[in-house]
Regions:
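Phenylalanine-focused residue identity feature
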Residues: 6, 42-44, 75
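Short alpha-helical catalytic segment bearing the HExxH-like zincin motif
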Residues: 70-78
Length: 115
């Protein structure tokens, strides 16, 4: 899939989709905007290993769309959290710099058609 079509792919193919990671089915859901309960923090994405759910934000707090690169990177980022959690690498899943770095590298490789 070309990167330029990824945003449409996310909206058409990922919305309310299930994926299998290891032996578990994970649900992926798109949210317009994800703010903390106190409205002080914004999340581009979130994964929940207990409920096997991944959420991706499609809009920023100011209601503008999340740009394509950020959405792609967040998708990879949250999938990596899920992969590590399923593989019983909880400590590594909680390592945000590691997950962020691998997500950025995977996206870069994807853009080079190396994946």
């Amino acid at each position: 899939m070309r990167i330029s079509g990824f945003l449409n792919y996310i909206h058409m193919e990922i919305k309310n989709r299930q994926i299998k990671i290891g032996n578990s089915k994970w649900k992926i859901k798109l949210e317009e905007s994800m703010l903390s309960e106190d409205k002080e923090s914004f999340y581009f994405g979130m994964s929940n290993a207990t409920y096997k759910k991944i959420k991706l934000s499609t809009k920023l707090p100011d209601n503008t769309k999340v740009n394509n690169d950020s959405l792609q990177e967040t998708y990879y980022h949250e999938i990596l959290h899920s992969i590590l959690s399923e593989g019983q690498y909880k400590e590594e899943s909680d390592n945000e710099p590691l997950v962020e770095w691998i997500a950025k590298c995977l996206l870069q490789l994807k853009k080079q058609n190396a994946l």
